[in-house]
Amino acid sequence: MDYLLFWDDDEYPVACIKNGEKGDITWKEQDNITMHLKYIQDADVTIGYHCGYTSPIPYVELNEDIDENLFKEYIEAISNEVVSWESIKEKFVKDNGITYADPKIANGEGVYEQKDEGNGNWVVGSTLCLNLNHIDKIPAFYNPEGARGEDTFFSVNLKDSKIIKVPVYHFHDGFLKYTGIVRKQYPRTLKKIRASDEEVEQRFLKASRGWIRYKPLLLYITDKEKYNIKVKENYEKLKRSI
């Protein structure tokens, strides 16, 4: 085996492109396998893009469903380089918690080499391809028992690896509300996914437990000197916000 491509079972090879302010969507099929194979030979890792419901955090009306400052503290307590308060709030305010595809990227434009940002070279665990011929540049996947974050810990050990960002999308159906997409049943619009749905609530709770369990190890790896201070800060934020 030369290459290994990760593809989550709640992701589909299409891009959702928003048409203007009305929110009608153009769906564009994506050739994920071919696109990764095109670039992986000259890389250690290739990583694509996600659109749709890119995190298991449901939509909430800030200061109506929940106090914004408390929600901000919660997100900060579980955040990493990929999930941050700024990115979550922007999606809520701009597009009801949905990430839409960039048309140029969906058309295969814009490949580039992704560089280490100081604490790692950040990737996520799907639309992720590994070059097994460069096994010395591929760190292990690991997460604490019952936790999330195996792609996060993988990322912090990619500092000396060559990562190519490839212009191809997966649609992430994080709440399994659009499984018809695999049969090319494409909705004209995407709806807000709220926590009032019991299945959505349980998905969010499970994800939250996983984030809380992995955060101490992430803090230790990325900032040992301030570990005790940051763990205490996180604990206080969780105590106030949960």
Predicted feature residues:
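Terminal low-complexity segments of carbohydrate-biosynthetic enzymes
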Residues: L176, V182-I242
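Acidic donor-binding loop at a coil-to-helix junction in glycosyltransferase catalytic cores
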Residues: A147-F153
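Short, electropositive alpha-helical surface patch
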Residues: D24-I25, I33-K38, D42-A43, P58-V83
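Conserved nucleotide-sugar donor-binding
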Residues: E113-Q114, G118-P139
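Short, flexible, basic/aromatic active-site loop/helix in glycosyltransferases
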Residues: E68-G120
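Short beta-strand-to-loop acidic/aromatic patch adjacent to the donor-nucleotide binding site
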Residues: D2-G20
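Conserved donor-nucleotide/metal-binding helix-loop-beta segment in metal-dependent transferases, i.e.
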Residues: V14-Y53
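Catalytic donor-sugar/metal-binding loop of nucleotide-sugar-dependent glycosyltransferases
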Residues: V156-H172
